[in-house]
Amino acid sequence: EDGSRASLPEEFYSSRFIVDKMIEYIDRDLTQPFFGYLAFQAVHIPVQVPPEYRDRYEGVYSGGWEQLREDRFKNAKKVSLISDEAEIVAQPTEFRSWSNLDKEEKYYYEQAMMANAGMLENMDANIGRLIAYLKETERFDNTIFIITSDNGPEFNHPTSSALFNVWRLANGYHDDPARAGEYRSITSIGPEWAFAAATPGNLFKFYASEGSLRVPLIISGNGFLQEGFNPALLFVSDVAPSILEMANIPKNIQKKGIEMTGRSFVPVLSGESESIYGANES
């Protein structure tokens, strides 16, 4: 931290700690504007979460991954995220059917998905703590929030690697489903849950498909935003120039002679333009 080796608190939990530090930084001088980059580790392997968050999802995923994907696809249509004419992509034939799993397998994967969902909700709750702090310090109304993800759901299970298992056991990690999400646990939802979690997209992380490359982008704050859902194509490299325009900072910034890439998507947010990319650009 600031060029010095940092230490973690005894009761460290990444989502809570990241927000605690951001509040600490902002609190140092409330008279100054701020830019905060919160690089949450949720949801990422090893997938750990306070048990009360995991337990909130008891029974939610007992219907299996096919049912979850079907339900989410229907809901996506209901809230107009996709068109009424859209057709669901079938689960790949090499994937397992939930009905073919035995009792122990179902228990393992249900607990894994509960931990995954709980970790995501916990991150959301900590973002809520930051929002509450900004409201208390009268900084909320002048703050723009941008929330996105780097890729679609992760499907790999690290314990499938013999080399990783050597490291896991040497460092005291376990994959006991009864303790999924607890300290020193390591959990993976597998390809079937990942496929369902990416709904309505196809596939997941590591693939050149919508389930991997198309992620949510949530932006709020500071009145110029046009409310609602927008399907415009944007890239993560467009975030930085957009922030600069929102803050009225010159965008012709160079680093070692290299200009910043990306385009400002403010015209899309304000309703001035439908897209910042042409139909043939990607």
PLM-predicted stretches and their roles:
Residues 183-210, 224-232, 236-282:
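C-terminal cap/loop subdomain of S1 sulfatases and analogous C-terminal strand-loop tails that border
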Residues 1-10, 42-51, 272, 279:
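Catalytic-site neighborhoods of secreted/periplasmic enzymes
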Residues 7-15, 105-121, 187:
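Short acidic-aromatic active-site loops that bind/stabilize oxyanions
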Residues 16-20, 70, 114, 121-128, ...:
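A structural signal for well-ordered alpha-helical segments within the folded catalytic domains
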Residues 1-7, 95-112, 216, 220-225:
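Short glycine/proline-rich turn/loop motifs
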Residues 48-49, 132-220:
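Histidine-centered active-site microenvironments of extracellular/periplasmic hydrolases
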Residues 15-94, 119, 123, 128, ...:
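Active-site regions of oxyanion-processing enzymes, predominantly non-cytosolic
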Residues 34-39, 144-148, 200, 217-219, ...:
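Structural recognition of the beta-strand scaffold that forms the well-ordered cores
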